[in-house]
Amino acid sequence: MTAIALAVAAIPEGLPAIATAILAIGAYRMAKKNALVRKLSAVETLGSVNVICTDKTGTITKGEMTLKQISFIDSSYMIEEDKTKISVVPSDGNPNEGNLEFLLSIIPPHVGDDAQIVNDNGRTILKGSPTEGAVLYAVYKLKGPGWIDERKRQYPVVKVYPFDRFRKMKSSVHIIDGKYLVITSGAPDVILSRSTRVLTRDGEVVIDKDTWNKLRLLIDELGSKGYRTFGVAYRWMSNFSDEYSDEEVENELVFMAVLGIIDPPREGVAEAIKIARKAGIKVVMVTGDHKSTATAIAKMIGLDVDNGLVIEGRELDKMSEDELQKIIDKVVVFARATPEHKLRIVKAFKARGYRVAMTGDGVNDAPALKMADIGVAMGIKGTEVAKEASQIVLLDDNFSTIVEAIKEGRVIYENLKKPINFLLSCNLGEVATIFGAELLKMPIPLKPLHLLWVNVVTDVAPATVLGLEAPEPDIMDRPPRPVSDRLITKRKLIYYIAMGSIIGAALLLLYNVLLKEGLEIARTTVFTSLVIAEIGLVLTMRSETKHFWELPRNRWLLPGLAIAILLQLIVIYTPLREVFDTVFLDARHWALSLIVPIAIILVDALRKSLKIKL
């Protein structure tokens, strides 16, 4: 009987179900906060994340692009919009209506089907490319749908060379009066590198060194305002063949204008970054945007650009893995980055010992999402491939949700430790009681059925309640959990062995005193005292450092403890007592049963007052 009792006492039978329930409840709470957990293990991993690599567009920013500025080399226009109309207002230089009109005319045929303006029950909706959509929408508001349709007829499309992330540009070829007009748009610096002339108010001018510098300054100036920059160029060709490659078409361009498109930061992102920084989490922005644009947005949201590095993709391409790892700690922004760069960035951070969360939405982001400790896909604009490669999907595509998910991950990890520690102490107390009684040659104080009842039934409600604790106020003031952190450390194990020994000693003392009143009375009182001891353990396990009266209220605590007591009353005061070999207890026996929980609370209060860490 003793051997069976020891075997039952040593195994916390309810632990797997409780741990799974806590993780599932945590995943449910995260889903309510727009973070959908695809893999349950990610819930626990989140608490140790110490670097977030995040996209800019749609995650840091709203993803709502609006054309704000059109800049030629010698003139600039601001786009002003109110509730009823949109207007183009000259801001500096010498306005040239002819150049502006030409630019507006070629935008609709060039955009083509890559962006569309549709009417949905009275609402104007943009579909397709958000960047081209922002430009097309401005033209739509300025000129109207009829004008746009007329321009498309005026510039019929012969061929389109679609945008790709390697060329960073798109070109369309149109036939007009027997000649071919090539319209190219994309990254201004790349388009400038393919241009030999620039459009001015006096016509086309060859780009010399001074002109080149002036155009570079113009691009950087718009980027420094936080605008996403969009370059437009063109060229005329007397002959064209459908077999021409993009390289044959996209050269000797006439640089036309730089367009500034604003995509403002989301509300709450700056505050979320402050919280992340306070929590010891490094935030790195990874974007395909121009360096000046990325830097400006980074400053707006509070990233420490002045004391960190902003690295462009072309600089990254020149670095070896060792060189990247040496500077990765200092990087705040990666600009002009590609999905391949994302993968290298994740590898570099992991090589430095970081736990990395990486966001992504495209098919090509999948390798980086898989490589990251936590892959975070976008729920709104993300592809199915990205979602499948991720552990978490953001239902609102919002950066702030990542920080909230990390907070929830920390809470869940802390709450996962509490029932484990609780059950460990309970079971060690049971083992100490059975083993001590055997050493002292006393009759076995707890039968295997009693121990099973405690482990499988009455322990479950209090342990689950511990897993539902509210976050401690300073949860995001602590550094991330080290990767080497363990649920049970040597110090904790020693403490819980000591706590189990105290429980065992107190129960044996009580048992010895009551044996003279009869074996059934002594066993029933010890059995009940063990269940009530859970009250003391639950109260002490709510926090490793704070007294239970200093913690936020847990609305599930009293119901959980009440369920455990009610279940114990059932096996004492109903016919089930014959199954469990229990007898009625009077008020004195119930009072004696309180000795163990009081001892537990006093010992733990002393430890916390002396600030002895586990």
What are these regions (language model features)?
Residues 541:
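A C-terminal functional module that forms or caps the active site or interfaces directly
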Residues 1-479, 487-488, 501, 512, ...:
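Conserved cytosolic headpiece of P-type ATPases
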Residues 480-496:
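The cytoplasmic-loop to transmembrane-helix boundary for the fourth helix
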Residues 494-508:
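Alpha-helical transmembrane segments of multi-pass integral membrane proteins
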Residues 458, 502-504, 524-538:
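Generic alpha-helical transmembrane segments
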Residues 519-523:
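Transmembrane alpha-helix entry/boundary detector in multi-pass membrane proteins
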